[in-house]
């Protein structure tokens, strides 16, 4: 009997506990909504707290939102809902594809009522009714009509961007152009040497341009390197030269600025000592130019390079690169003319006794040490080195003016590259039209060389000019 009573009591207790668990009331918040909103302490009196009673407010205790991990059943339910949502979206997309395929399916012969997207794609690719006839004479018109939006998108102009860089950020990195003027004034007497009579560098040349066009093959305008080397480019008059490209206008090869610059480079390298082993390299030609011929030739080349830089085609970066090389070669010949005569041991060791070929010298430019003449006066041989150095030093002012003019052209290249990189027309207005005249911004979009490359070329050019000046002055000091 006691055991049966104990079991009945335990069973009733468990039933009451389970019933209580099923009908448990939700937990309310400790603070009412009015006190929680005002952020004051609530007396927690139910059904109305003391503050709400005093103020006559509606006291409402909200349900407490229990935090914690989501139960496993709830997680599965959420995952099923996401899968159902994705499936419904996929079905809606398939319905849209099938609805859009109905007009095309009606155009195709013998097509079932229910067409799949894959079969529709294959039919649209292989069907001759949907593709333009590219074999006919009107293929281009059919292609434009078939996909006009594609061409309009591909060739749409770029929208200009805002200019956020001032023009004064572009600076020349070549140094001061007048850094060697004092060297000429201190160590050289210009009254003895005489002022050069050639005034071609100070003349202003007028260029006439015409917009004539003719279909001439660019291959007809080319000149071989061997023919170019045999021509004398120093006497070419570029004052009235039209430097329109050969594909647009019939221009003589010798009158194009780029061809003339290449001719100068070939002409300056033709008399240089070289140990080239290629066939036809003219190693047997040992004739060296005299100092007078070097001075005369360099003077003519410098004058012609100035005319090239005054031409509108000097905005071409390829031409400016060739002009840099020509100026480097001109200064190399000036240095060779001012250099002291090599010793007898150097002259004997210049030829390799075993092969009989001339070996590479320290300097590729060599001149014949014939006494130079200044205004018809030549020395007896004792002052040859000093006269040559004075003559070279008097000619370096031409090179300095040429470097300054070339620096202006390089500044224009840097400004154009800056404007093209920013892509803003307002940048052009702030910089000025004079700096970028003659070249459209679209032509500078694909610049072959970067601005730092030209900066380094200009810096090396001025450095080389200083070196030649100091070498020449050093010869004058020792003689």
From Swiss-Prot:
Alphabetical UniProt keywords: DNA-binding, Metal-binding, Nucleus, Transcription, Transcription regulation, Zinc
Ranges where the record places region Disordered: 1-25, 63-100, 349-382
PROSITE patterns: ZN2_CY6_FUNGAL_1 (PS00463), ZN2_CY6_FUNGAL_2 (PS50048)
GO CC entries: nucleus
Molecular functions (GO terms): DNA binding; DNA-binding transcription factor activity, RNA polymerase II-specific; zinc ion binding
Subcellular location: Nucleus
Family annotation (InterPro entries): AflR, OAF3, Zn2-C6_fun-type_DNA-bd_sf, Zn2Cys6_DnaBD
Record-level GO BP terms: aflatoxin biosynthetic process
Principal subcellular localisation of the protein: nucleus
Keyword Nucleotide-binding: no
DNA-binding residue intervals: 32-59
Biased composition (Low complexity): 1-20, 76-90
Effect of deleting the gene: Leads to drastically reduced, but still detectable production of dothistromin.
Matches recorded under SUPFAM superfamilies: Zn2/Cys6 DNA-binding domain (SSF57701)
Origin: domain of life: Eukaryota
Reported function: Transcription factor involved in regulation of the dothistromin biosynthesis fragmented gene cluster.
Name of the molecule in the record: Dothistromin biosynthesis regulatory protein aflR
This protein's encoding gene: aflR
């Amino acid at each position: 009997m006691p055991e049966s009573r104990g079991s009945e009591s335990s069973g009733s207790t468990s039933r009451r506990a389970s019933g209580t668990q099923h009908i448990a009331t939700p937990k309310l918040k400790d603070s009412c909504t009015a006190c929680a909103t005002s952020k004051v302490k609530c007396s927690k009196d139910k059904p109305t707290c003391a503050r709400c009673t005093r103020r006559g407010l509606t006291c409402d205790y909200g349900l407490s939102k229990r935090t914690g991990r989501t139960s496993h059943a709830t997680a599965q339910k959420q995952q099923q809902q996401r899968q159902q949502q994705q499936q419904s979206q996929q079905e809606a997309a398939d319905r849209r594809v099938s609805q859009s395929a109905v007009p095309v399916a009606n155009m195709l012969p013998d097509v079932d009522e229910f067409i799949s997207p894959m079969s529709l794609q294959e039919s649209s690719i292989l069907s001759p009714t949907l593709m333009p006839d590219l074999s006919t004479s009107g293929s281009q018109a059919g292609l434009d009509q078939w996909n006009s939006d594609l061409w309009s998108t591909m060739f749409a102009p770029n929208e200009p961007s805002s200019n956020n860089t001032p023009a004064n950020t572009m600076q020349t990195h070549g140094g001061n152009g007048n850094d060697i003027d004092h060297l000429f004034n201190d160590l050289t007497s210009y009254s003895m040497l005489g002022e050069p009579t050639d005034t071609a560098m100070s003349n202003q040349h007028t260029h006439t341009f015409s917009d004539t066009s003719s279909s001439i093959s660019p291959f007809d305008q080319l000149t071989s390197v061997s023919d170019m080397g045999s021509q004398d480019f120093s006497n070419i008059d570029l004052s009235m030269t039209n430097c329109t490209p050969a594909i647009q206008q019939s221009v003589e090869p010798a009158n194009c600025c780029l061809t003339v610059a290449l001719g100068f480079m070939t002409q300056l390298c033709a008399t240089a000592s070289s140990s080239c082993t290629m066939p036809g390299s003219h190693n047997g030609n040992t004739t060296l130019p005299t100092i007078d011929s070097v001075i005369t030739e360099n003077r003519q080349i410098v004058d012609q390079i100035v005319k090239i830089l005054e031409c509108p085609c000097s905005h071409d970066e390829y031409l400016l690169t060739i002009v840099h090389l020509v100026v480097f070669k001109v200064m190399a010949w000036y240095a060779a003319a001012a250099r002291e005569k090599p010793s007898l041991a150097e002259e004997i060791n210049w030829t390799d006794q075993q092969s009989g070929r001339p070996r590479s010298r320290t300097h590729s430019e060599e001149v014949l040490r014939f006494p130079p003449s200044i205004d018809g006066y030549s020395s007896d041989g004792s002052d040859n080195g000093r006269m040559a150095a004075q003559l070279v030093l008097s000619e370096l002012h031409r090179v300095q003016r040429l470097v300054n003019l070339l620096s202006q052209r390089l500044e224009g290249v840097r400004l154009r590259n800056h404007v093209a990189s920013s892509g803003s027309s307002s940048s052009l207005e702030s910089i000025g039209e004079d700096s970028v005249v003659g070249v459209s911004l679209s032509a500078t979009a694909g610049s072959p060389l970067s601005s730092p490359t030209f900066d380094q070329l200009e810096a090396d050019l001025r450095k080389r000019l200083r070196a030649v000046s100091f070498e020449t002055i050093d010869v004058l000091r020792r003689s």
